Swiss-Prot record:
Keyword annotations from UniProtKB, A to Z: Carbohydrate metabolism, Hydrolase, Multifunctional enzyme, Polysaccharide degradation, Signal, Xylan degradation
A single MF term (Gene Ontology): feruloyl esterase activity
InterPro entries attached to this UniProt entry: AB_hydrolase_fold (IPR029058), Esterase-like (IPR000801), Ig-like_fold (IPR013783), Ig_E-set (IPR014756), Mycobacterial_A85_antigen (IPR050583), SASA (IPR005181), SGNH_hydro_sf (IPR036514)
Signal peptide: 1-24
Protein name: Carbohydrate acetyl esterase/feruloyl esterase
Catalytic residues of the enzyme: S55, D271, H274
Pfam families: Esterase, SASA
Entry domain remark: Is predicted to have two esterase domains corresponding to distinct carbohydrate esterase families, CE1 and CE6. It can be hypothesized that the release of acetic acid is related to the CE6 domain, while the release of ferulic acid may relate to the CE1 domain.
Protein family (similarity comment): In the N-terminal section; belongs to the carbohydrate esterase 6 family.
Length: 671
């Protein structure tokens, strides 16, 4: 039983925050509690405030790190419900920290109201709050004469919250207030309610009735105990309950001892109904400042950790990979990328891009923002890690990479990148999404097929075309070359310039979407993606030759691939020289190759090989971790004709592979 006056706080150990799911033996220590100084006499320097209302008093925003620490023994809470996970017992004072209302509620204005009074009032004065609030409750729910009828019409989702207060929130508030009066003096009443009663002309009168009941039941003097009513979310005039603002502003006309706490400029969550964490802090400070002035003290604000503001240059432009209608991601002229995501409930958001992680910063409006270092030109995958889980940025187009759907951003090159961009006046080919049945795997499979612009012209109705089978890399899929690689634009531009002959390009999944699990051994490498080879040879090629106007002989069939797709290209072409006459790899994942004996000694007779393979090309990036320079050197020493190029300033990335494709295709199907 709490006694008449407050003494020092018991239990010197700090609060241990443990998950609620842990066993009782591992739960946190009980919160610090107050002891008594004098028995039977209220402490005149212990100021108590009653807090009631609906969801914005209950608290809707997730508390952040600065909200979870107690401001010390001068700010106390008498819980209105038991909260075992925090060691709280109903009716027993403890140090106040979020959440104040009930388990699973959020940050409330009362949190920073108390902190503001601690900062503003003399050190010998303590602050205590009693907090009873229910999301969505009508003001009738706090009227003793109306509660029984209200219980009959209350929505089902509210009944559990009502039951937490024994179906009488007003009675719970008064019972605890009477107990608290043995320890201190009630100095004010804080209310945030009205959204549910928007447009109700009787609302102000019912608020006055609640206030009068409290004053009567607790023997309070109205001239000494004001009611402080916070206004609703405004959201620049677009708040869901903006119609309630006027009736709250006019409350003092009915209740002369009330004061309205402005919510102008208080930030809100995306629902435009509830404040976000920054908005609750600001509104809470305003409650505290109003009370401090009423008590005769100059208000002082507690320290609030403000979000770091990220300035976006005026010349920053929306990335081409951004979903239309979104403002972010953006890129500036230095190649820095700017990201923003609305995540008002998130604790931590991290941007993961280009092998670097950036802690995203709150902007005070429910968003997280980040700016990167200058990024290399080209395409980059990225993820947003929210509370420890990777998510795709909803503002960006999606791309299959990293073994899953991913976010991506393009950092643009200058005019040197025009070869992979669509150009006005250049006829555009088609990229078709097709499904075909694989007898090898007894299932339907998906492929992408590029046909040149002239393929559909009536004059070419009988013309046949050579085919390039083009493979993606590990962790990607058949859409990679047309989405990340811009293959179709490379083909269109090269064909329009007369640099490449019109050809069909077929892109299929190489069965290497999932991570490589074969271990660091030759057998594992040989097996990874090998299931695709019989599908390609026995299902896909026959399907393409049957359904498209192809030239179906080996002289008119090429294969190329990037990274592991280059490995697959070697495996397929070098063991099927009766079916392919052209070969290319871009950052090809070709390891441990003994050129003298590989593939049954296919390179041993250079003259014979050079007759069968009309053109062989290998490229890699200057900063690539997979380089083919040594293999090229060894092949040339054997007399094998192989063209090669090192892409300047690029790594194992799509810009390397775009360049490789652009350099490869002009040599195809020409004798």
């Amino acid at each position: 039983m709490y006694q008449s006056t407050l003494k020092t706080i018991l239990l010197a150990s700090a609060l241990l925050i443990l998950p609620a799911s842990m066993s009782a033996q591992k739960r946190k220590a009980a919160p610090k509690k107050a002891a008594t100084e004098q028995v039977g006499k209220p402490d005149p320097n212990f100021y108590i405030f009653l807090c009631f209302g609906q969801s914005n008093m209950e608290g809707n925003a997730r508390p952040e790190a600065q909200d979870l620490t107690s401001p010390g023994p001068r700010f106390l809470l008498m819980p209105a419900v038991d909260f075992p996970e925090k060691g709280r017992k109903m009716g027993e004072w403890c140090e106040a920290s979020a959440p104040l209302c009930r388990p699973n509620t959020g940050l409330t204005p009362a949190d920073w109201f108390g902190r503001t009074l601690v900062a503003s009032l003399p050190e010998n004065i303590k602050i205590g709050v009693i907090h009873v609030a229910i999301g969505g409750i009508d003001i009738k729910g706090f009227l003793p004469d109306s509660i029984q009828n209200y219980l009959k019409v209350a929505p089902n989702w509210m009944k559990g919250m009502l039951a937490a207060y024994d179906n009488n929130p007003y009675e719970r508030l008064v019972t605890l207030a009477k107990k608290a009066q043995k320890d201190g003096v009630i100095k004010g009443i804080l209310m945030h309610q009205g959204e549910t009663n928007t447009g109700d002309p009787k609302w102000a009168g019912m608020v006055k009735q609640v206030y009068d009941n409290l004053c009567g039941d607790l023997n309070l003097k109205p001239e000494e105990v004001n009611l402080y009513a916070g206004n609703i979310v405004q959201a620049d005039g677009k708040g869901v309950c903006i119609g309630c603002k006027k009736q709250i502003d006019e409350l003092p006309l009915t209740l002369h001892t009330s004061q309205v706490i402005s919510s102008d400029g208080c930030t809100n969550g995306p629902d435009r109904l509830h404040f976000d964490a920054a908005g609750y802090r600001e509104l809470g400070c305003r409650y505290g400042e109003a009370v401090a002035r009423h008590l005769g003290y100059e208000p002082k604000r507690p320290y609030i950790e403000m979000p770091k503001q990220i300035e976006v240059p005026a010349d920053a432009f929306i990335a081409e990979t951004t979903v239309p209608g979104n403002e972010f991601p953006k890129v500036d002229k230095e190649g820095r990328a700017y990201f923003r995501i609305a995540a008002p409930e998130a604790r931590k958001v991290v941007l993961d891009i280009c092998n670097k992680k950036y802690d995203m910063q709150r902007d005070g409006k429910g968003n997280f923002m980040a700016v990167t270092d200058p990024l290399p030109v080209g395409f980059h995958y990225y993820f947003l890690n929210i509370n420890g889980v990777n998510f795709i940025d909803p503002s960006t187009e999606t791309f299959f990479g990293c073994n899953r759907e991913s976010g991506g951003i393009e950092i643009p090159e200058g005019s040197e990148g025009d070869y992979y961009r669509p150009q006005q006046g250049v006829p555009a080919g088609q990229v078709r999404s097709i499904y075909y049945y694989s007898n090898e795997q007894q299932t339907w499979r998906h492929a992408m097929v590029y046909t040149p612009a002239e393929y559909e012209l009536a004059k070419n109705a009988k013309k046949r075309y050579p085919v390039l089978y083009l493979q993606h890399g590990m962790g990607e899929d058949e859409t990679g070359w047309s989405k990340q690689g811009h293959m179709q634009h490379i083909m269109d531009n090269a064909i329009a310039k007369g640099e490449a002959v019109p050809m069909i390009v077929v892109m299929e999944s190489g069965d290497i979407k999932a991570p490589f699990g074969g271990g660091n051994n030759q057998a594992g490498r040989s097996a990874y993606g090998a299931s695709f080879y019989p599908v390609l040879l026995n299902d896909l090629i026959p399907y393409i030759d049957s359904n498209y106007r192809t030239k179906s002989d080996r002289e008119n069939r090429a294969m190329a691939g990037l990274s592991w797709g280059g490995h697959q290209t070697f495996d397929v072409v070098l063991t099927n020289l009766d079916k392919f006459a052209w070969l290319g790899t871009f950052s090809g994942a070709i390891f441990g190759l003994d050129v003298k004996t590989a593939y049954d000694g296919v390179f041993a007779n250079a003259d014979e090989f050079n007759k069968k393979i009309h053109y062989m090309y290998m490229n890699w990036g200057e900063e690539d971790f997979i380089k083919s320079g040594d293999i090229v050197k060894q092949l040339r020493e054997l007399g094998i004709k192989v063209d090669s190029n090192e892409s300047k300033g690029t790594a194992h990335e799509w810009l390397t592979w775009r360049r490789g494709l652009n350099e490869f295709i002009p040599h195809l199907f020409k004798k």
